[in-house]
């Protein structure tokens, strides 16, 4: 969804309480918010509950949405904050479950050239990503999977842009070391 489309949906919600707009937001953003919540709480049921709660809260506070500048970032921050609230309530540590995150492989946009990359290559890349530290993995997935800008990731995670850059450099270096360069250029 484009940022303009998300802005339009937020406007429809805030001005007229358009139920179709909340349904469309839910349909378009549920999976991304769920993945973020899951990466924080490490529990599928809790992540689903948290994600649904985000949309309930958006609906309840819809009159305040007119002032939101970046709806996508706002939704991600809501999911992150709700997940952290959940952890505080459960008195749990923030975790990323390496085993369970296999349920969320990176989605690759496939061009004809990329079709030549073997499933072994994709498996190698995903294996490297799974071996990244939890923080590095989260930063990498937010940039590459969620298509967030470094500034947005920094704001979302309350870290500096330099930290985002450093984590991305670590991830990309490890991937490039594990994957032959001939495959990366196709």
Give the location of each predicted region.
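N-terminal module of bacterial RNA polymerase sigma factors
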Residues: 1-32, 113
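C-terminal edge and immediately downstream basic/flexible tail or linker adjoining helix-turn-helix-like DNA-binding
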Residues: 2-3, 12, 95, 124, ...
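Internal acidic/polar
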Residues: 3, 93-115
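Sigma70-family region 2
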Residues: 15, 55-70, 90-91
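Short, charged helix-capping/linker segments at alpha-helix termini
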Residues: 15-23, 35-51, 184-186
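Structural recognition of an alpha-helix C-terminal capping motif at a helix-to-coil junction
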Residues: 35, 49-56, 69-81
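Arg/Lys-rich amphipathic alpha helix in sigma70-family domain 2
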Residues: 63, 80-97
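Helix-turn-helix DNA-binding module
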Residues: 127-130, 134, 138, 142, ...
């Amino acid at each position: 969804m484009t940022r303009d489309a998300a802005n339009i949906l937020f406007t429809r919600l805030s001005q007229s309480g358009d139920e179709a707009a909340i349904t469309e937001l839910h349909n378009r953003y549920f999976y991304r918010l769920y993945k973020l919540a899951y990466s924080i709480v490490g529990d599928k049921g809790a992540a689903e509950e948290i994600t649904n709660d985000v949309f309930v809260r958006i609906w309840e506070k819809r009159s305040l949405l007119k002032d939101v500048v970046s709806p996508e970032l706002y939704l991600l921050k809501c999911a992150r904050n709700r997940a952290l609230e959940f952890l505080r309530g459960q008195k749990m540590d923030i975790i990323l479950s390496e085993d369970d995150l296999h349920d969320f492989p990176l989605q690759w946009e496939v061009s004809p050239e990329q079709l030549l990359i073997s499933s072994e290559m994709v498996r190698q890349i995903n294996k490297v990503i799974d071996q990244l530290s939890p923080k590095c993995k989260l930063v990498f997935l937010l940039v590459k999977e969620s298509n967030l800008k470094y500034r947005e990731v920094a704001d979302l995670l309350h870290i500096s842009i330099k930290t985002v850059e450093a984590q991305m450099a670590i991830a990309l270096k490890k991937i490039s070391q594990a994957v032959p360069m001939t495959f990366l250029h196709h």
